[in-house]
Amino acid sequence: MVKIGVCGPVGSGKTALIEALTRHMSKDYDMAVITNDIYTKEDAEFMCKNSVMPRDRIIGVETGGCPHTAIREDASMNLEAVEEMHGRFPNLELLLIESGGDNLSATFNPELADFTIFVIDVAEGDKIPRKGGPGITRSDLLVINKIDLAPYVGADLKVMERDSKKMRGEKPFIFTNIRSKEGLDDVIAWIKRNALLED
């Protein structure tokens, strides 16, 4: 089972990305989802209502505190959810774990996630990639979402591309508009090639 952690600031599109990935990949792969929220299970409920996945393949973890701690320093609640999901589905191939909304320093405990996708959105401004932080610099894949909003918020995608290359070196990043599915095929191709080790 490959575990992919998806993190990023509140409203960046983490849940939308996971919903789109399950919609496009669950026909071919044995998948499940774990979501994290501080005081609710709102993202899990959204997934249950909108995803093609059955309810028993989605677990919502209510962290009750700092979202970063629940995926990094004390990942015990999430590790228990991983164990529970693996018990339900022993042949699970791909588990997507969504962090609660966090800042640019969010990273996953290596025991919890084999790969990390960090999601930011253009509406936060084109300066976000150059601000760095472990989410930007260390994630296995950076997804720059909501590119359709660039002209409305004065964000320059060329600046974001330049700064992402500078901050990430050889690590990949993908521009997306998850709502319209633009860039989604590239994210899926990255998962298949890097996490699932397909050609």
From Swiss-Prot:
Entry GO MF terms: GTP binding; GTPase activity; nickel cation binding
Q: SUPFAM superfamilies given for it?
A: P-loop containing nucleoside triphosphate hydrolases
As recorded in UniProt, coiled-coil segments are: none
Q: Which GO terms describe its biological process?
A: urea catabolic process
Which positions are annotated as binding GTP?
8-15
Q: Which domain of life is it from?
A: Bacteria
Q: Where in the cell is it found?
A: Cytoplasm
Instruction: Recite the UniProt keywords alphabetically.
Output: Chaperone, Cytoplasm, GTP-binding, Nickel insertion, Nucleotide-binding
Q: What cellular component GO annotations does this protein have?
A: cytoplasm
The function of this protein is:
Facilitates the functional incorporation of the urease nickel metallocenter. This process requires GTP hydrolysis, probably effectuated by UreG.
* Family membership noted in the UniProt record: Belongs to the SIMIBI class G3E GTPase family. UreG subfamily.
Kindly state the subunit structure of this protein: Homodimer. UreH, UreF and UreG form a complex that acts as a GTP-hydrolysis-dependent molecular chaperone, activating the urease apoprotein by helping to assemble the nickel containing metallocenter of UreC. The UreE protein probably delivers the nickel.
Give the protein's recorded name: Urease accessory protein UreG
Q: Per the UniProt entry, what species is this protein from, by scientific name?
A: Helicobacter acinonychis (strain Sheeba)
| Gene name in the database record | ureG
